[in-house]
Amino acid sequence: MPLLSLPMVAAKPIKNPSHLVQFKLSELALRGKTQLETHKFLAALRQVESGSDDQVVGDNGKAIGGFQIWRVYWQDAVDYDKTIGGKYENCFNRNYAERVVVAYLNRYAPEGASWETLARIHNGGPKGYKIKATEKYWQKVKRELEKQK
């Protein structure tokens, strides 16, 4: 599988300079998907979640960053992929948050999962693809994916 190389990006300071960190992505792909497909999917998720604004705080303060990551989601991802490291607050950094999302989905998505299944897991948790309430979310992500064609 080819590697996706992205430049190093410094996260914006959140409350104080101690939150300023850098992350380098050397490899980023969802299991069974190419890196280009993964990149497009992540862009669609980010657009739906936050309008691609990485500094958003939502869900009454429970979700942060462009992917609207909850602390429990982040913890599941870093427990699965210990190379992620960092702090929850690093989810304001797009590249870091992408690693978190990929790890979470690789942890919980069944082998060969469709884009729909992946989007619904992101939105509704490990069994989110079985929850009727995540169907509307998938339709939004699907529209974003279609714009990229």
Which positions does each model-derived feature cover?
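Short linear motifs at secondary-structure transitions and domain/linker junctions
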Residues: 21, 41-46, 96-98
